[in-house]
Amino acid sequence: MAAQPVSRVVRRVLRAGVRSCSSGAPVTQPCPGEPVVEVLSRPRPFLGEHAAPFSAFLTDSFGRHHSYLRISLTERCNLRCQYCMPEEGVPLTPKADLLTTEEILTLARLFVKEGVDKIRLTGGEPLIRPDVVDIVAQLRQLEGLRTIGITTNGINLARLLPQLQKAGLSAINISLDTLVPAKFEFIVRRKGFHKVMEGIHKAIELGYSPVKVNCVVMRGLNEDELLDFVALTEGLPLDVRFIEYMPFDGNKWNFKKMVSYKEMLDTLRQQWPELEKLPEEESSTAKAFKIPGFRGQVSFITSMSEHFCGTCNRLRITADGNLKVCLFGNSEVSLRDHLRAGASEEELLRVIGAAVGRKKRQHAGMFNISQMKNRPMILIELFLMRQDSPPALPSTFRNSLRVQVLRHRVSFSSQMVTLWKGGGVPQAPLVAQRWLGSSLPQRHFSSHLDSDANPKCLSPTEPQAPAASSGPLPDSDQLTHVDTEGRMAMVDVGRKPDTERVAVASAVVLLGPVAFKLIQENQLKKGDALAVAQLAGIQAAKLTSQLIPLCHHVALSHVQVQLELDRTRHAAVIQASCRARGPTGVEMEALTSAAVAALALYDMCKAVSRDIVLAEIKLVSKTGGQRGDFHRT
């Protein structure tokens, strides 16, 4: 380890000669031209009494040595994932407030001198930063730094990896949440699945082993692909890392969307009973498993169900220069401001030491974390890449994919391995080819309506109203819109508590081959049928109380209407979701939205065919309210 810039004796004097107290709040900002220097916030006698082999400034009050630093190079990204950013978008930091290359290297140099031996570059998407290769090359010159890693979405990886390897990059994590090209495009709102697979292929070709693939598992989106991801490790030196879905500001975390480590493990063991656990490395965040005879392995990142705080050795620096000692904490210290105020190396170390000293024993747990205010993930780093819950896939879309995955799992795995061994760029998985033919869907629409009628409904810190009863009420055998004399009556919701209400409904329009082809190619004389239907669905949701006589008026905070073309049935699958905070549910708004979108699609196509059938108008799910949640199976 490199020599320490400040001796242990000097550090003891500094700690003993200054009194301090701490409330646990973030470090205050320095006055212009005058850096604020903080001392360690609590005594740590074991550091003063023993000759510590590791920097006192990077050792917290629980004895954890922080030897791993993650640096975000940018807040920007070349994908537009539905669950990486809040719906209202992310205001990017002005360029002048971001760390410069020299500031990044200055901080990295300081941390390495104190004992950090591993640095991982993150984002945003780090590979869109123009000087990323130069940064890696200069980091490689730091004495004592053993590992330089990068976490990327893989879009630019194949092109840049040869240069990065030459510069000194030693580890790669690639974020990929699905093996189905159509679903990939649905998730990230961009094409690029084959570029990601090409990047994985290039990493293997250049000798990186294992190549780590990060997959955030979310119920209703990709939990049905667990076995496909594991099958890839049979012939490829991959470490597929399944990550429990975690809450961040703006992603409306829902516990029901989290698939726990034990549930995932049970799923894998049903297919591979011989799955064996591997020894865990010290400070590892992953629980590793291997199937005998497979080249690669599988890991689980269990931040929510079984945290690993006791061995945490990680610190994070955001793109705007703030130090985060815990990924889930909202306390940050601006190292950038101290740097620009002219703080000396010793002063910077004391600021860092104060922040590390305040690090808690463990994070708050999954239920409390979901209520905490924190940065959106895109503004921290891309480690787990995309933590939000996207709109649920239409049930017919999801079920079609699941059937194909199960039917062709072995073929898909062997096809991928054959392609890798052959050195070619992997093509679309068999599952996608069977569902879509040889190409991706030509058209996909997704729209959002955000209303400021009730802005509080999206706040993760908004206190929940007390429930009217200790549990959900059973379904009633009485009609609530009929009074005791059998006459219609509007339900009085004035005494019901306000709660977050979400409902999803779907409809299917069986178009027939002629109308389907015209819509697919956007050749209808009336114009863009999907866009018109989409807009009609949004309008209908807002007007539901005027169409359904006894329906209450609801101040909707969000409406989303999606249309997918299903070529196997020559059909359009419509999904409408509505959200509001109030005393009554929004299932009627969702159902009306889906139904009117289907009617509008019929109207656009009726000149071509009157044999069109509107089918399967149904409620898919609802959450919130005294009667509990409903999810159609």
UniProtKB/Swiss-Prot annotation:
Its cofactor is [4Fe-4S] cluster. Residues 446-480 are annotated as: Disordered. GTP binds at residues 70, 120, 151, 212, 314-316. It catalyses: GTP + AH2 + S-adenosyl-L-methionine = (8S)-3',8-cyclo-7,8-dihydroguanosine 5'-triphosphate + 5'-deoxyadenosine + L-methionine + A + H(+); (8S)-3',8-cyclo-7,8-dihydroguanosine 5'-triphosphate = cyclic pyranopterin phosphate + diphosphate. S-adenosyl-L-methionine binds at residues 83, 124, 175, 246. GO terms for molecular function: 4 iron, 4 sulfur cluster binding; cyclic pyranopterin monophosphate synthase activity; GTP 3',8'-cyclase activity; GTP binding; metal ion binding. Residues 410-633 are annotated as: Molybdenum cofactor biosynthesis protein C. [4Fe-4S] cluster 1 binds at residues 77, 81, 84. InterPro entries: Aldolase_TIM, Elp3/MiaA/NifB-like_rSAM, MoaA, MoaA_NifB_PqqE_Fe-S-bd_CS, MoaA_twitch, MoaC, MoaC_bact/euk, MoaC_sf. The active site is at residue 603. Residues 61-295 form the Radical SAM core domain. The modification N6-acetyllysine is found at residues 195, 525. [4Fe-4S] cluster 2 binds at residues 309, 312, 326. NCBIfam families: moaA (TIGR02666), moaC (TIGR00581), PRK00164.2-1 (NF001199), PRK09364.1 (NF006870). Isoform MOCS1A and isoform MOCS1B probably form a complex that catalyzes the conversion of 5'-GTP to cyclic pyranopterin monophosphate (cPMP). MOCS1A catalyzes the cyclization of GTP to (8S)-3',8-cyclo-7,8-dihydroguanosine 5'-triphosphate and MOCS1B catalyzes the subsequent conversion of (8S)-3',8-cyclo-7,8-dihydroguanosine 5'-triphosphate to cPMP. HAMAP family: MoaA_B, MoaC_B. This is Molybdenum cofactor biosynthesis protein 1. The lineage of its organism: Eukaryota, Metazoa, Chordata, Craniata, Vertebrata. The gene is MOCS1.
